[in-house]
Amino acid sequence: MAIKGRYALVALSTALLATVVLAAGAWGEEEKKIEKEFTVTPGGNLTVETDIGSIEIETSAGNTVRVEATLIADTRSQSKAQKIFDKFELSFAQSGNDIEVIGEYIDERGFWDFLSHGGDNFNVHFLITVPQKFNLDLETAGGNIGIGDLDGTVRAETSGGDIRLAEVKGRLRVRTSGGNISL
């Protein structure tokens, strides 16, 4: 009886472990990239306002603003990831030399429910390239902000992340509610 009990325990443990491994394997990271490019001249203005996401600003010698937004959902299925992506509206506008990028989560359940999605994780990463001489007005409700090698006025605000500035020349106004600021 003791041997039968051991075999039953080993079989049950193996079945339980297999179930856990298979369930864990069902989770995966899905990405959706959105890219937009605008022709500008140095000295223009970029405004980014987003409900969630990190914002990384790089500079170039060119006359373009290039926005690459990567939406990332860590969820059980591609179709569920697409439903999450569909609730994040990203809009772009250009008026002369000014560029505006707005990221907004649209859901009747509310912002904090959106962050969890029943255990699914969602994030956005903005990688934006601007001319070296450009002005920035950046705001994210949840994410880090990084800016490097820029000559212009900067306003950067995050409610839940760090702000990193490297070789930025011009007036600065930076604020974080839950992170560090490094100049």
Language model region names:
Residues V10-A23:
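Bacterial N-terminal signal peptides
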Residues M1-A8:
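N-terminal secretory signal peptides that target proteins for export/translocation
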Residues A2, A23-E49, S54-T140, G148-T158, ...:
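Acidic (Asp/Glu) and glycine-rich low-complexity loops/linkers
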Residues A8-V10, V40:
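General helical structural elements
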